[in-house]
Amino acid sequence: EIFMPTEFLHGLYDGGHGAGLYDYWEMMRKHPRCAGGFLWVLADEGVKRVDMNGFIDNCGNYGADGIVGPHHEKEGSYFTIKQVWCPIQIRVDSLDSQFDGKLRIENRYDFLNANTCRFTYKYVQLPSVTDKGGMKVMKQGEVNCPDIPAHGVGTLTIPAAMKGANALLLTVTDKNGNDLFTWSYKLEDIAGLQQVSAGNKPSYRSEERRVGK
């Protein structure tokens, strides 16, 4: 039997699409009989009321459950879904100013080699809370993904952290030129920002039971 839940997360007012998706997906990936799953739903549903000056009527809370809004505006969970389901994953949680340019990456494609993708890197200087200017790009470039077969892991090499940059942006692009995801890493403490602990990650256990046993 193949397990493929038709609605394992519901996004009412963006309260459920991204929340918990990582835990569900990591558990589902470990079971060979799991073929994937469905999120409900892609876009907020509503009727444009001509008698209310174009107001989008969601019939209370029955239709505001999309990954994107009624005008296809991206909601918070949109970016979480892109990250969790990105076929190329960076297996690094944090970096610092001593970053040597090497990153462990995982190819989650079922058939494609990772070398069909490219990475764009940007070393940037983010402004402090009192700065009036915007983000400054200190150095940028492109590199090919290394030769990593489907479901394999390997090392991506980019130039090491440069002096003056306090953050790194990494964007992976597929063979068709589609941006799959952009990661951002803090390299140095940014003036005016307070460090906040992320807390402990949740844990889970899984077991399989046969009906009638």
Regions found by a protein language model. Name each.
Residues 1-104, 108-116, 120-137:
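Extended substrate-binding grooves/exosites of carbohydrate-active enzymes
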Residues 85-98, 186-204:
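Extracellular ectodomain segments of secreted/surface proteins
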Residues 101-103, 119, 141, 154-156, ...:
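Hydrophobic residues positioned within well-ordered beta-strands of beta-sheet architectures
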Residues 122-124, 128-164:
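Intrinsically disordered, low-complexity Pro/Gly/Ser/Thr-rich segments with frequent PxxP/GP/PP motifs
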Residues 161-200:
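Terminal connector regions
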Residues 166, 205-207:
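Short, compositionally biased segments
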Residues 208-213:
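Conserved small/polar residues in nucleotide/adenosyl-binding loops
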